[in-house]
Amino acid sequence: MPKILEFDESARRALERGVNRLADAVKVTLGPKGRNVVIDKKWGAPTITNDGVTVAREVELEDPYENLGAQLVKEVATKTNDAAGDGTTTATVLAQALVNEGLRSVAAGASPILLKRGIDAAAQAVSETLLSRAREIDERGDIAYVATNSAQDKQIGELIAEAFDKVGKDGVITVEESQTFGMDLEFTEGLQFDKGYISPYFVTDPDRQEAVLEDALILIHQGKISNLAELLPLLEKIVQTKKPLLIIAEDVEGDALGALVLNKMRGTLSVAAVKAPGFGERRKAMLQDIAILTGGQVIAEEVGLTLENAELDVLGKARRITVTKDTTTIVDGAGDQSEVNDRINQIRKEIEATDSDWDREKLQERLAKLAGGVCVLRVGAATEVELKERKHRLEDAISATRAAVEEGIIAGGGSALVHAAKTLEGDLGRTGDEATGVAIVRRALVAPARWIANNAGAEGNVVVSRIAELEPGHGYNAATGEYGDLVAQGIIDPVKVTRSAVQNAASIAGMLLTTEALVVEKPEEEENAEGGHGHSH
């Protein structure tokens, strides 16, 4: 495939145009008065959203050079979303401001390498400042504020606070679609571990990239499964039950994996396979936890059980299993509650007996998984479009709340960044182009606050100047149009979200400024559309 190349200033300008086009579409969603974006879908109803990362993911530009710029910013949004579950729009706005300011300096003759060094140092300093100003949260009211802020919906905030109340900060909260209107919360005994599906062919919901198994059987195997002949007798019995199957094993490979994928593709058997969590002795213990919770048995040579002679009664059962690329959640296992309680007490005794901090931490994780349970938030709406949008907001709000519990909170509304910019006023003692890099970050940090104000119909630059005069923790409440103590008013952001946004934006901006050449595939020549028929005029 032939390539085309672009160099120097024109390459960077093309990237900048792509960054601007994507960021302009995303930043209209920022703040309590952010607008919606309607996204056309090839199939089904269009999506209406005010979630930055959803907008970013949909953008593909026609010009290949501009598209590279857009993809880089998309990376900022996605990385921030992965790390903190929110803050994608803030990260995009920051990246755009850094790129625009930075390219201006490069065009004026500054060294991109030194600029990048200054930008990185400034991002690190801002990140540390934000952390030092963070306030820990444990109050239910604070949790409700964070969730309300993320979802822009008080009802969602209250529900999530209640969910965290029930499962604690280590517990699992999942979101399911409901047939009724409104939202409700259900607490079920369940367990989640950090292993996802072995093959993406097991996915049942392509939109969300998940495998969902309802009323499923669970095969728990301590070793590897690679030989199809060993697995076949049990598989045939399972197919007759017409129930979906989850396989948890050290690994599933070779013939066995091929046969499972083939059966899944043909619709003979709804199946998903995941690797067992943990290592060594801990893996054995966790498999035993899963077996007790689901009423199954671990198939292992040491207890005289092999795959060939296994019957259906060694399989566990659960009402619902959700497998993503990274996690597996088992809800409502069919295990005997008294046995589960015995297991929980046994783990508690082990925690008291151990003198290793690492062991204690891992045992507490197992305890939280067994005793904590799973909170299921059910969400319903009048239309499919509204349902997707509400579900998305709920998931974002849960991630943001987790981030807040982890690292604490700071004032929201972009004001924490305006105040953090003051730590960069002496250019961190840098000189020359490095000092310019620090100054670029200082100027870019006010962009989120400016856009929150602009979207609310206020004059952004005036609002930013006013915020800078206030003490840290105070700022502009875009919902009411007033200035005041934002933390007291419940306008707060998780510090992890804001830090991730700054660091990811700085990382991409630094890479973009130091770009000197672009290589893209040459577009194929369009065939003559008339194909030789008819007359040309």
UniProtKB/Swiss-Prot annotation:
E.C. code: 5.6.1.7
Identify the enzyme class: isomerase
State any GO CC term. Answer: cytoplasm
- Catalytic activity, per the record? ATP + H2O + a folded polypeptide = ADP + phosphate + an unfolded polypeptide
Localisation per UniProt entry: Cytoplasm
Q: Name one Pfam family in it.
A: Cpn60_TCP1
Q: What protein does this entry describe?
A: Chaperonin GroEL 2
